[in-house]
């Protein structure tokens, strides 16, 4: 008995020692370039940002030229009402000027909306962008998730959701197309949902950050429903589609005039600076850049999904945004393992372990240029 006991103790101690010596998974956000480059001893300038979801075409050359010729605008305050910018937004979205609010990025508008609605109970379609939960926690309400189902390819079952909704829900938050699943809700289904929410007194926030990347953008956007429903607000920005995350320009659309006035009352004056207002106006009018983006994303997204569909080590899901969610099917291989395989090739994808309801089997990557996309395909082929 004593020999057996000692053997067990020695075996246990070996396991403990092995666990201590194992490389600890680093603590960083999947898109934290500085920390990731430092941890893996990489030159950050050489890392391809497959986790950032930003348009690979970069900032429009025409917008760069226009900005260079109008730098004197820095010496002037922006128009407090952002009249010219709102006219550009109205033309771009085919909406009325009176329905528009301009902000310092979509993040400011998300924060402003949540703080002013101050929901006691909020429902999020998950898994989704973590900033919604962070803002909701700041106002102290109860937060719940309605999780999209993997077996349904993360598509929303609109009937099941509407059956779930109750009148004690104050706010419903939807990202469409959704991050990180890249799934989307049609305008027709969104109309059904808004109708039910209106009857229950539920306000809906729809984040359309990625809608312009969708192959059927106009049949997915809720913008056309703005005049018909006053119980929701669409929020968009230019960080992703127009490759301008440093500009911090976003806008919201709602026909709820009372709520719109509340937002304006609590928003800081000149929330968007002169450069942001001017550049935003030029971006929305740059039809050549918009067309080139649609063409590039559509062709490369189709190619990447076709290639990955032929591998038995991964599963991909229908993608409506400029990014693709991938499930790792190979036994014993985690999302972090795949992240590390990619980062050692200077390719930074997103390990989705931190997303609500996603375990360590999922990664996400965005569409980049063909050469870098090929390099990432090689990583997946090597699994």
Write out the residue ranges for each language-model feature:
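Active-site phosphate-binding strand-loop segment of PLP-dependent enzymes
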Residues: 150-214
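PLP-dependent aminotransferase class I/II
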Residues: 59-60, 81, 231-317
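N-terminal "arm"/small-domain region of PLP-dependent enzymes with the aminotransferase-like
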Residues: 4-76
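PLP-dependent aminotransferase-like
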Residues: 116-174
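Helix C-cap/helix->beta junction micro-motif
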Residues: 139, 199-200, 229, 345
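Short loop-beta-helix segment that forms the pyridoxal 5′-phosphate
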Residues: 78, 90-112
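Conserved PLP-binding catalytic core of the aspartate aminotransferase-like
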Residues: 298, 311-345
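PLP-dependent enzyme catalytic core of the Aspartate aminotransferase-like
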Residues: 4-7, 188, 344-347, 354-383
């Amino acid at each position: 008995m004593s020999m057996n006991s000692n053997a067990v103790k020695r075996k246990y101690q070996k396991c403990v020692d092995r666990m201590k010596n194992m490389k600890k998974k680093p603590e960083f956000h999947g898109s934290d370039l500085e920390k990731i480059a430092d941890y893996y001893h990489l030159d950050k300038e050489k890392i391809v940002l497959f986790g950032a979801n930003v348009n690979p075409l970069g900032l429009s050359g025409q917008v760069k030229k226009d900005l260079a010729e109008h730098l004197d605008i820095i010496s002037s305050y922006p128009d407090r009402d952002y009249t010219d910018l709102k006219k550009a937004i109205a033309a771009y979205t085919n909406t009325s000027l009176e329905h528009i609010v301009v902000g310092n990025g979509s993040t400011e508008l998300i924060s402003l909306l949540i703080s002013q609605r101050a929901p006691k109970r909020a429902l999020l379609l998950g898994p989704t962008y973590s900033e919604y939960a962070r803002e909701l926690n700041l106002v102290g309400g109860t937060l719940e998730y309605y999780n999209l189902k993997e077996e349904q390819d993360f598509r929303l079952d609109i009937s099941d959701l509407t059956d779930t909704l109750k009148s004690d829900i104050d706010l419903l938050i939807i990202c469409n197309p959704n991050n990180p699943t890249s799934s989307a809700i049609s305008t027709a289904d969104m109309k059904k949902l808004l109708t039910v929410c209106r009857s229950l007194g539920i306000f809906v926030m729809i984040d359309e950050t990625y809608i312009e990347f969708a192959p059927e953008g106009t049949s997915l956007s809720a913008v056309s429903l703005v005049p018909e429903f006053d119980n929701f607000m669409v929020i968009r920005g230019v960080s992703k589609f127009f490759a301008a995350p440093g500009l911090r320009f976003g806008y919201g659309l709602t026909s709820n005039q009372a709520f719109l006035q509340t937002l304006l009352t609590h928003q800081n004056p000149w929330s968007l600076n002169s450069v942001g207002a001017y550049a935003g106006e030029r971006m929305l009018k740059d039809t050549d850049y918009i067309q080139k983006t649609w063409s590039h994303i559509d062709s490369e997204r189709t190619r990447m999904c076709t290639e990955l569909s032929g591998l038995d080590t991964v599963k991909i899901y229908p993608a409506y945004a400029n990014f693709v969610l991938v499930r790792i099917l190979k036994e014993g291989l985690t999302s972090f393992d795949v992240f590390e395989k990619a980062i050692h090739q200077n390719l930074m994808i997103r390990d989705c372990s931190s997303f609500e309801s996603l375990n360590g089997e999922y990664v996400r990557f965005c569409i980049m240029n063909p050469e870098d996309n090929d390099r990432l395909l090689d990583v997946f082929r090597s699994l």
